[in-house]
């Protein structure tokens, strides 16, 4: 009797695992949940986007954007005074210097007029950037009236103060000149990569 019930238990367990992942989304081998809890806020996956670099379209990371209210309007997301959560799931190794350069270019392209006011806070963010390996994450949580909490591979580094900084930082992906158009499109609910 024990022999017959073991396969049933195994099949049931496998089905339960499969059901548990139905509510998630996948992009280039990265699986993320549809809903997350950030402190007291329940956030919903707005979209997944693939960061590609160079003319060869090298896959760098899959970004997952969580918001309080799903939207296809980047300006509405940026303007919302609600928590936002951006997770970059690296799919290749990236030097910390390259990450810093990407942030500099992103601020320059999407928040140029604000750069003088943001300079010291950008430097604070840059100080926390390190080499990232495939499978590691950078996580940024925008907290209304507080700024952006920065987490490097599961370790909170601190918070860069100011809602103005949080908006300018998220504009790197949601502003008029994202790192690549498909990345922004995916974060706004379109196809990932």
Predicted features and spans:
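Bacterial N-terminal signal peptides that target proteins for export
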Residues: 1-9
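Hydrophobic helical h-region of N-terminal Sec-dependent signal peptides
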Residues: 10-15
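N-terminal secretory signal peptides
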Residues: 24-78, 113
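Mid-length scaffold segments of soluble, non-membrane domains
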Residues: 69-143
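Short strand-turn-strand beta-turns centered on an Asx-Gly dipeptide
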Residues: 152-154
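Flexible glycine-rich active-site/ligand-binding loops centered on an Asp-His dyad
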Residues: 157-183
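Cysteine/selenocysteine-centered motifs that mediate thiol-based redox chemistry or coordinate metal-sulfur cofactors
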Residues: 182-193
